[in-house]
Amino acid sequence: MDRKERVARLVDHATNPRYKGPLEDADVAMPGGGHECGGSVVVYLKGDGNGRIEDLSWTGQGDTISTGAASIIVQKVHDEGLGMDEILDLDYGEFVEGLGRDIIGSRTRHATLGLSTVKAAIRLYQRANRSGGRAAV
């Protein structure tokens, strides 16, 4: 993908976000971000109890980079059927490279807000699942 295509993809995801909206039956609702990182998101996760994700969505607001990147990572999870451990293993640097480091510039925190919040939601879900409880929603 060249630079122009990467910019168009990011803008498309920011203006037409995928999987955006709360999950009513989520096991986890994980807030992330703040003013210092380009926006805020809440990631909603429903797990199957066996390391797989039944459903994943997000809500939030921010700049084109933070909202576009959040939409891209959630769509990637859906499209590729990634398991929880696979998501936790995703490399932030590789994710930023895929978005286009030249586009992101110094706004790495904006670009990784969605991914870091998805990872935090998974860790909370796994802790609750190991202890036999339910994650805080």
Q: What are the roles of these predicted feature ranges?
A:
Residues 1-24, 29-30, 48, 75, ...:
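C-terminal binding/interaction regions
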Residues 3, 7, 34-36, 66:
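Hydrophobic alpha-helical segments and helix-packing faces
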Residues 25-28, 55-59:
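Flexible, solvent-exposed loop/hinge segments and secondary-structure transition points
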Residues 34, 39-49:
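Short beta-strand elements
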Residues 36-37, 60-70:
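Short, thiol/selenol-centered motifs that function as redox-active sites or metal-ligating centers
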Residues 45, 54-56, 73:
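Helix-adjacent hinge/juxtasegments
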Residues 57-65, 79, 106:
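Short alpha-helix boundary/capping segments
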Residues 69-80:
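Short, internal acidic amphipathic alpha-helical interface segments
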